[in-house]
């Protein structure tokens, strides 16, 4: 195991392309502001996909988002191509190479791509997955289907960070959310995953890179959130995005098994252009208390295994513990922060 969620093969894994962290919540914000982001004012930082208020259907919103998503991935691939080229020219790891069988046999350094017999890996991170999925779900449900909100009202609410718009925020927070075994939202999540993998499969080799889709942010969803304004899932401006393939903070209301099922339903098992998917789940102490609780936990892990999911990390915490940790972090250093 390498890091938190990756499996590695000794003496087979060789070149691993430095990964790109892509803020897909930025792609969503570019849809709302026609290629702009609130933090950067009038600067055009993405594609100009049209005025949000002019979209007449959810399909048009989704099409605009996917254009922004593909544009970010494409630029990440171009960047990775240059990194790969420069890395082999300027970096070397003599000690690590001397310990690797294939490097010794081929007289090549680990930083060189295409070592005979080796497995070349690379990946890009989807940061803000559930934030984007939940936001698109809320737009689809509340604006285009139930018509409880107008596009103008949504833009005004997020543009003002929901100050004076708490009623709208509550509507958004109670829209269908990923992590609740709700096919309405999970189908959107599966589509975003599919489109990312299809793009990777088609264009990765053309651009000279091997890049798989990965959802392991470590803690990057926190600083990435600091450049993203309020989002249509009810998230406040510049607060953390969702982490990994986990549900948005506080959005998983139907229990931990529902989170597993959403994670399963959003994966595209037929595609191979995917890597690790980090999944964090919180359990209350009462859920795992005593022999009965231990048995429940065992069955939960078995369910995760049977669903062929990649990674599972559960933290046994209650709300009061987390609040105390915020006040006195030095007393809670053993809490896992991934």
Language model features by range: what are they?
Residues 1-336:
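Conserved catalytic cores of very large enzyme subunits
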